[in-house]
A protein has these predicted regions:
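Membrane-interface helix starts
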Residues: 1-8, 12, 16
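Membrane-helix entry/capping segments
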Residues: 1-5, 33-35, 46-50, 88-91, ...
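Alpha-helical transmembrane segments
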Residues: 12-39
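Residues that recognize and position ribonucleotide moieties
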Residues: 21, 53, 90, 95, ...
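Loop/turn elements at helix/coil->beta-strand transitions in domains of secreted/extracellular proteins
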Residues: 38-39, 70-72, 155-158
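Short amphipathic beta-strand/extended segments in non-transmembrane regions
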Residues: 42-45, 58-116
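Structural beta->alpha junctions
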Residues: 46-51, 86-88, 164-166, 202
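Mid-to-C-terminal secondary-structure elements
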Residues: 80, 93-117, 126-202
């Protein structure tokens, strides 16, 4: 569980417009299964009314480019996948994340690997890292599951990694699958600064 408190406010000039961002530091109530969890911060955009909002893709890219005090900045979006295993299809809580996410969390795979930068490109993003529980229940805890294909939203994804049993992210959701978050340059909606759907960690 996180208690979010304001750490500091960062003013960043983007073109002719000055954007004000509130940087939130995660304070640990219960020890989280990450290395140096006290160094993980959640970044929000603050609207004129002072309310925290998620972040648009162009804003995330600005922050990532301009970041000076953070070693890495990652974006993620929570989703539900439709998983077609051996039984009836079921919803699987998931996350689409930039490859930097596991770097920010200093998290390594229990089996296989996490994402590589090349998998943030549309067309190269059909890989998945699964939770230890998913691997046990759905894939028989078989090490040979690495390299196998599973169906998420009727699309084949190659299993490249299994996370450790204690790994949770986000901690408020029982996430079972992580896939790369690739930004399509042809997606005009995604290129809008008004389309705020990302959570940023650094």
């Amino acid at each position: 569980t996180f208690l979010l408190v304001s750490l500091f406010t960062l003013a960043l000039g983007i073109g002719a417009t000055t954007a004000i961002f509130s940087v939130i530091k995660a304070v640990v109530l219960n020890p989280l299964p990450y290395e140096a969890p006290e160094q993980i911060a959640v970044l929000w955009e603050v609207n004129p009314e002072g309310n925290q909002e998620r972040v648009a893709v162009p804003t995330y890219e600005d922050w990532k480019r301009e970041a000076r005090t953070l070693q890495a900045v990652a974006a993620y979006r929570q989703v539900d996948f439709s998983y077609a295993g051996t039984g009836d299809p079921r919803n699987v809580p998931g996350v689409r994340a930039t490859p930097d996410l596991f770097t920010v969390l200093r998290a390594q795979a229990f089996l296989g690997r996490t994402f590589v930068p090349e998998e943030s490109v549309v067309g190269a993003d059909r890989v998945v890292v699964v939770s230890h529980g998913f691997w046990t229940r759905e894939l028989g805890a078989n090490p040979a599951a690495i390299g196998q294909s599973i169906q998420l939203d009727a699309v084949p994804f190659t299993v490249v990694g299994v996370m450790p049993p204690v790994f949770e992210f986000p901690t408020s959701t029982n996430v079972e699958a992580w896939t790369p978050l690739a930004f399509d340059p042809k997606d005009l909606h995604g290129a809008s600064r008004r389309a705020r759907s990302l959570t940023i960690v650094g």
